[in-house]
């Protein structure tokens, strides 16, 4: 089946987000310039397709990736996982993580390892 332009755009957006996930500077401006659209356009499209703001969309993917690493990667520390997913501040990472998953990164790690 042919992909719709929305699907193609989402693929591009996901690719950019995944490639830059460890970069704290990843934001709507960077995303827009990488996919070649205006900031407003990217923001509106994401809102329409995911019901999230660009900021929340990026944050969600960061946290999903962090959760996957916490569950799987036995060699990485919580700090390393925070940095790997673009957080520069550990307490900010922990509070964002707790907000989404209802437990601290450490609790999550202990439950899944």
In which residue ranges do the predicted regions lie?
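…primarily DNA-binding HTH/wHTH and HhH modules…
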Residues: 95-113
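Short, Lys/Arg-enriched, Trp-marked, Pro/Gly-tolerant hinge/linker segments that flank
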Residues: 1-11, 33, 48-56, 60
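Basic, amphipathic alpha-helical hairpins
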Residues: 14-26, 46, 50, 68-76, ...
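Append "Primarily bacterial transcriptional regulators
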Residues: 29-37, 42, 46, 80-88, ...
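Terminal helix-turn-helix DNA-binding modules in bacterial transcription factors
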Residues: 48-88, 110-113
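Inter-domain helical "communication" segments and dimerization helices
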Residues: 1-23, 110-113
């Amino acid at each position: 089946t042919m992909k719709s332009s929305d699907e193609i755009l989402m693929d591009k957006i996901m690719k950019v987000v995944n490639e830059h996930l460890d970069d704290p500077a990843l934001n709507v401006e960077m995303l827009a310039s990488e996919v070649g659209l205006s900031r407003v356009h990217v923001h509106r499209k994401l809102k329409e397709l995911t019901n999230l703001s660009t900021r929340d969309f990026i944050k969600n993917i960061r946290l999903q990736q962090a959760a996957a690493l916490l569950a799987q990667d036995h060699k990485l520390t919580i700090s390393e996982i925070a940095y790997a997913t673009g957080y520069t501040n550990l307490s900010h990472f922990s509070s964002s993580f707790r907000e989404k998953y209802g437990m601290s990164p450490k609790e999550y790690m202990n439950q899944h390892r």
